[in-house]
Amino acid sequence: MEEFQGYLELEKSRQRDFLYPLIFREYIYAFSHDHFLNGSILLENSGYDKKSSLLMVKHLITRMYHQNHFFFFTNYYNKNPFWGYNNNLYSQMLSEGFAVIVEIPLSLRLVSSLEEEEIAKSYNLRSSHSIFPFLEDKFPHLNYVSDVLIPYPLHLEILVQILRSWVKDASSFHLLRFFFHEYCNLNSLSTSKKLISFFSKRNRRLVLLLYNSYVCEYESIFLFLRNQSSHIRLTSYKGLFERIYFYGKIEHLVKVFANYFSAILRVFKDPLIHYVRYQAKSILVSKDTPLLINKWKYYLVNLWQCHFYVWSQPERIYINQLSKRSLDFLGYISSVRLNPSVVWTQMLENSFLIDNATQKLDTLVPIITLLASLAKAKFCNVLGHPISKPTWIDSSDFDIIDRFLRISRNLSHYYRGSSKKKNLYRIQYILRLSCVKTLARKHKSTVRALFKRLNSELLEEFFTEQEQVLSLIFPRTSFTLRRVYRGKIWYLDIICMNDLANHE
């Protein structure tokens, strides 16, 4: 009954946009604990378990009720042997609670916006592969591209001010600001970049919240001016744009830009500018002349410097021709190349050949980057020669083969959209031979002897599994299956790429 009453209080707080009381509710920390337990640094504490977790939450709430000014920023718990060597335990718990609480108004606005627009929850749009069909459709008809790395604010107060437009509750806002500043002072973190790096190992949800709020603020202004309207027509962003005083801020900003950058505003009417972003990297693509995209470059620099107080050098944003330079984006090396074709035409008694060259987007596997990742994970040396994985020899043969198979399957799944599969086959060969060497080292046998015994099984596991899956979708004809297996396939279930060494 008490838990049910707590959820009722949570609903009331949501309706009133008053989040401050939630910081004193135990179920908030229970939500965050369940989410972060598997990947939390709390697991490094030998004295930490579920029972002590509940005791620590109660202790944290009690101390906050007594207004001891965030005792977790002091050396109080350093003297208590119960906490072991994890000196940031309380601040870790509170940061996880903050992340859950601040997400509440954001998620509610997104859900309400989706309901108003009657948008179906399509999880396929979350896949990184969903971007490539758009690139294949647009890039062959465009000429110039500029890849832009979004700079990050140097001062923490900028991030706090951005969050202010999301959080109505002034108490929660000031509490969050105090937490950030005290945390930076305690750990000698002078910039927000250091804070993000520090938190990325402890609370990734809070890191993503800070970064996404900044990027959303930047893109909201960017797209607002791009569309030249008070109403954003892009439904995918609508849920993120309805914020307090948003349109008032934008109208004021438009007046400023109209007075000082009137020439730039005329650029927005051009419909041939395309914008794509993934994480911190964005791409601007245009047609005809580089003048248009060059104006956009200076517009972005002025936007960052005037609105976010972020220094960015225009000289470091390069504009290149798509036909002459490859683009490193989303783990692929993409470029536009001519695809020549010859058509035999016959008119009456005359027959002749017609050369027809079309532009096509090539997506290649970045072999150098993947070899460096494999070498870092100790699957091969820096030259790409397979080596054994000594840290795995204590596992069973089945677990060793299963680990290598999962990594090979993940890489094959992600890079099935490659135009050429030769580099992908090379990576799979390295993993297969590294697996054999690991087993040989475990059994103190030679690679040749072990490879003869396991060769057929490994070949079947590593190289025929993809064909077995495709055979369930397409007719079992060798010609059709061979064409499908060599062609491009973009999967819409890929949210992120797992780390090679920690793939589970």
UniProtKB/Swiss-Prot annotation:
Family the entry assigns: Belongs to the intron maturase 2 family. MatK subfamily.
UniProt protein name: Maturase K
Outcome recorded upon mutating E217G: In cv. Borszczagowski
Main function: Usually encoded in the trnK tRNA gene intron. Probably assists in splicing its own and other chloroplast group II introns.
Gene Ontology molecular function terms on file: RNA binding
Top-rank taxon, per record: Eukaryota
Recorded coiled-coil stretches: none
Database matches in InterPro entries: Domain_X, Maturase_MatK, Maturase_MatK_N
Keywords for this protein: Chloroplast, mRNA processing, Plastid, RNA-binding, tRNA processing
GO cellular component: chloroplast
Localization annotation: Plastid, Chloroplast
One Pfam assignment: MatK_N
Keyword ATP-binding among record annotations: no
One record GO biological process: RNA splicing
